[in-house]
Structures are given as C-alpha cells and as structure tokens.
C-alpha cells in the first residue's frame, strides 16, 4: 500500500480501494495512520453557531435553509460576550480547536471586523481557530489570515456529478473557488463531505478524489453522516450502512495520510464499537459538545467514557505553518 503523499490519484485507483475486502482496507488505513500520527491520540474540536437559520442556500439536507419549513427558530448574530463565554467553556472542556459557523451564503465585508474580533478571542485562549462562513473572496481570506485564523471550513459535500441533486443555489466551482482563495491566503483548508445524501459509491470516491488532488491536501477532512431533518427534502433518506461509512473513513485516510479525518455530524447515532472502528480505520478528530450547529451530537460524558475505554488521549493544539 502506497504511503507517499500524492496529488495525482485516478478514479479507478480510488474505486479499487473501495472494493478491497473490509479487513484488508481498514488494516492498510490503520498502518498508514500510524506512520503519520500517534494512533492513540485524537484531536477535539468545538463548534459554535454564531448565526442560526435563514440561509438563502437550498441545500436539501439543511435545517437552516430558508427554503424549507423546519422546526428551527431563526436567530440573529450572537453578541461578542456570549461568544467569549463559549470559547472559555470550550477551553475548560479540553477542546483544542474552536470552530464558529454562520448560516450565510457568503461573508459580507461589513461583518469582517466582527469575525476578526471572534478570531482574536479564540487566539487569546491559545486555541486553534476555524471559521465556516460560506463563500469567501481572496481579499476577505487575507484579512482573516491577518487576524490569525488557522483554518477555514468549506465542505464540497459530494461529487461534482451528484452535486446538483443536493443544492442548486451555488455551483461546485463556487466551492472550489473559495477553497482556492483560502489556500492562496495561506489559511489551512478544512473540507469534507456528507454521506447518505443518496450518492453512489462512485460519488464518494469522486468526492475524496477531488479533495486528495487539491494542490494542498485539506489539513482537516470532516466526514458527516446525514442526520435527516424533518421538513427538508432528505428527511426520509435511507441511512448509510456502518460498514460503508467506515470504508469511506479508511479511503480518506489512505488518500490523505497527513490530514486529520474528523467524525462530524451523525456521530450521536454511532455505537462505541462503530466509533472505535472508525478510529482504527484512520479517524483522529471529533467534534465535542451537545450539538453540531442545529443537530444533536454525542453526549460529552459518553465521549469521555469512550476515549477512556479505548486508551485514547486528546492532543494539545498545534498551530500549523502554511
């Protein structure tokens, strides 16, 4: 199994990985994981929604879209003091990366000062900072970099071929353009996707291929399991199997050996045994807290119990050089 860092993967190679017998696949992924990381150490990230609901995008999985009638209550931007308290609480809980998100299509110039203030608060607690605020221009990204932003999250969600089954209000190229702006501004990329949208195995392969063939691999690759939201077009989507989810984690690890592969949304429905297999297959990051944006997350005490049983330690914040 190749352990070099590559940016020239071909689709047949990735599909072949998905077809490897399960035990062989996760073993190979685990060995690659051990070469690049301490396999008994995990990164813990926290996530705060600073603006909830009313998003103009029509992503068919999202409770925050203004296009669908969900039970979500729209909320305006949080005030800085509330955010400051959330950051301090995250620090006490052992989180080493603090992420904040807003239900925006894109960053507006008028909000840059507010965003930079949040970044400064995060950095003052000696935490890694990550923002997920929609599309971003190069000029805006440079301002965030100057403010000290370590990461910017902008998921591609799925493959280019399947993308328009998920959203039509922004293009796949829009997403890739933002990723390019983030990279040019020398901010580390956080980008992944969602499993269970109705995509095929080939779509999963193409999604990971797109990420693995970027000029720089994303430093973080969140893999989400669809949490069906009542009122959205995907509320009745069938659940992706545990085996298929773990396979995708393993392939992500093989394609992007140096990236943090994060268990993101949908983890609250996973047993300890499944999460342990995900960690064995190469996942080494997870979100900690009661909810992720608007969806439930695994119980904090349950997470502590899981990591204790597995003998897995949490890592301290590392500030990457771009």
Curated annotation (Swiss-Prot):
Keywords: 2Fe-2S, 4Fe-4S, Biotin biosynthesis, Iron, Iron-sulfur, Metal-binding, S-adenosyl-L-methionine, Transferase. The keyword Lipid metabolism does not apply. The keyword S-adenosyl-L-methionine applies. One of its GO terms (biological process) is biotin biosynthetic process. CDD domains: Radical_SAM. InterPro entries: Aldolase_TIM (IPR013785), BATS_dom (IPR010722), Biotin_synth/BioAB (IPR002684), Biotin_synthase (IPR024177), Elp3/MiaA/NifB-like_rSAM (IPR006638), rSAM (IPR007197). Its cofactor is [4Fe-4S] cluster; [2Fe-2S] cluster. Pfam families: BATS, Radical_SAM. Transmembrane segments: none annotated. The lineage of its organism: Bacteria, Pseudomonadati, Pseudomonadota, Alphaproteobacteria, Rickettsiales. Pathway: Cofactor biosynthesis; biotin biosynthesis; biotin from 7,8-diaminononanoate: step 2/2. Belongs to the radical SAM superfamily. Biotin synthase family. It catalyses: (4R,5S)-dethiobiotin + (sulfur carrier)-SH + 2 reduced [2Fe-2S]-[ferredoxin] + 2 S-adenosyl-L-methionine = (sulfur carrier)-H + biotin + 2 5'-deoxyadenosine + 2 L-methionine + 2 oxidized [2Fe-2S]-[ferredoxin]. It is an enzyme of class 2 (transferase). [4Fe-4S] cluster binds at residues 55, 59, 62. One of its GO terms (molecular function) is biotin synthase activity. [2Fe-2S] cluster binds at residues 99, 130, 190, 262. Its EC number is 2.8.1.6. This is Biotin synthase. Binds 1 [4Fe-4S] cluster. The cluster is coordinated with 3 cysteines and an exchangeable S-adenosyl-L-methionine. Homodimer.
